[in-house]
Amino acid sequence: RQCDWSSDVCSSDLDVAVMPEAIERLAKWTGSHDVIQGSRYDYDGGPFYWQYDFIVPLGIPNPIAPAAFGRPGYRVMDTLCFEGGLFRRNIVEQIGLPDPRFFIYWDDTMYGYRASKVTNPIVVPDVILRRTREIGNWDIAGVRQLNSTSDMNRYHIMRNRGYMARYFMSFGDYRPLMFGFGTLLTAAKEVIRLVMVDREHAKTGLVQIAKGWWDSRKLLHDPDWKPMPPLK
């Protein structure tokens, strides 16, 4: 879902509920920042850690980025989550719309990456969302958790790295060896997810991981691919 008012656009998703004070909580940041990511509560009411730091050369989120917001009260980020993202309309005009070819997964990450080329997106501690459904997960030492996902997601997690690489190429950020290592790490993470959280889908999940990885190579070498154009 999307809603817009004045010169700002906000985005949300279907498995989160917007807090009544969400707009007011984000409004105080709009005077000095063009892209703002609010925080959220997990399904159980506890804080939800979101990986705001994207390691561009590897093409993976940083799982150990500090959760504290520090003296400024916010963290600069180079990614985005469509659940609770707020961005000024002139940013959309400069970078274009989100790329629908991703279908699912990495689309919001890459939209935040594109936005970071024209402004400094931030994530703030103000809670504006609450998750509305419980997701099976593996708790990692009480610090991070690895959530359950579907085979369709597994396929697109791997396939869409082809699109990701193309955007990195268009901005001069593509490093083949490091990105390839990031793809290997991504595949390893998905295999671990299968073993620890989604074991009943191990056979079909491995097939989708391999298929998505194979198809990403086709996208990487597609001669007709072009990035999403700016709106103005």
Predicted segments, located by residue:
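Active-site donor/metal-binding and catalytic loop motifs
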Residues: V124-Q145
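Short, flexible, basic/aromatic active-site loop/helix in glycosyltransferases
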Residues: S39, I55-D78
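A short, conserved alpha-helix in the catalytic core of glycosyltransferases
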Residues: G85, I91-G96, R101-V127
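Conserved donor NDP-sugar-binding/catalytic core segment of glycosyltransferases
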Residues: A17-D53
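Single conserved hydrophobic/aromatic residue that forms the stacking wall/gate
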Residues: R1-V9
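Acidic metal-phosphate-binding loop of nucleotide-sugar-dependent transferases
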Residues: D15-A17, F102
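A recurrent flexible, glycine/aromatic-enriched loop bordering the glycosyltransferase active site
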Residues: Q2-C3, A67-F87, Q145
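Non-catalytic, C-terminal membrane-associated alpha-helical segments of glycosyltransferases
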Residues: M169-K232
